[in-house]
Regions:
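Conserved N-terminal segment of class I S-adenosyl-L-methionine
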Residues: 1-92, 177, 181
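A conserved beta-strand element that flanks and buttresses the S-adenosyl-L-methionine
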Residues: 98
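Hydrophobic adenine-recognition pocket in adenosine-nucleotide-binding enzymes
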Residues: 102
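A short, conserved alpha-helix within the catalytic core of class I
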Residues: 105-119
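Conserved beta-strand signature within the Rossmann-like core of class I S-adenosyl-L-methionine
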Residues: 120-131
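Acceptor-substrate binding/catalytic loop of class I
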Residues: 139-159
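A SAM-dependent methyltransferase catalytic signature shared across enzymes that methylate proteins
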Residues: 157-174
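Core SAM-dependent methyltransferase catalytic element
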Residues: 172-188
Length: 188
């Protein structure tokens, strides 16, 4: 219940993500699939690095920087995607941003994408899209379920694609991973 209330008020659950028991081993296979979608020789920044399993599966030619709301070890850039202002990541430091099950927890996805366009040309991500269309009893139940997870938004697949396309990205690849979709977007 506390998670629903915090999510309703759009608060990042820092305590939850500081507890390593809330970073599940089953997510490693998702990160392995995401790493396979990252082009070789990429300079990668991962948002929501967790246990940093993505780093293990990236092509050795890639460089990697973790970021998260809590410290995840050496080199971690610590900040919250729900706090403003978002940090300056420096000019020409990264090519690829990876979001593994993170965008659901972001309050203002359009603002984060606007910020991100200054820093990367490729986004590799997973997202658990909303299924219900428009206001309905089913939509209300789905929203409650998403709040229980701590998710702060309810984008359907086509809405998420549009958010990226409106910012100059084009969809390069997408596929299923369990109940989520894996996407690769590249700037035109």
């Amino acid at each position: 219940m506390l998670r629903i209330i915090a999510t309703f008020f759009k608060k990042t659950d820092r305590r939850r993500w500081a507890d390593p028991r809330n970073i599940y081993a089953s997510w490693e296979s998702r990160n392995k699939e995401l790493a396979a979608l990252v082009p070789s020789n990429s300079r990668v920044i991962e948002f929501g690095a967790g246990k940093r399993t993505l780093e293990r599966y990236l092509d050795p030619s890639c460089s990697y920087v973790p970021s998260d709301i809590v410290d995840r070890g050496p080199g971690t850039i610590v900040f919250d995607l729900n706090q403003r202002p978002l940090p300056d990541l420096g000019p020409d430091a990264y090519d690829v941003a990876v979001f593994s099950g993170v965008l659901e927890y972001v309050r203002d996805v359009p603002a984060v994408l606007d910020w991100l366009t200054k820093y990367v040309t490729v986004c590799v991500l997973t997202y658990a899209p909303a299924k219900a269309k428009g206001p309905s009893p089913r939509g209300l139940l789905e929203t409650i379920g998403r709040l229980r997870h701590g998710w702060m938004n309810n984008y359907r697949e086509e809405e998420l694609r549009s958010l990226f396309c409106e910012r100059g990205f084009e969809l390069v690849q997408e596929k299923d991973w369990e109940e989520q979709r894996l996407f690769v977007f590249s700037r035109r």
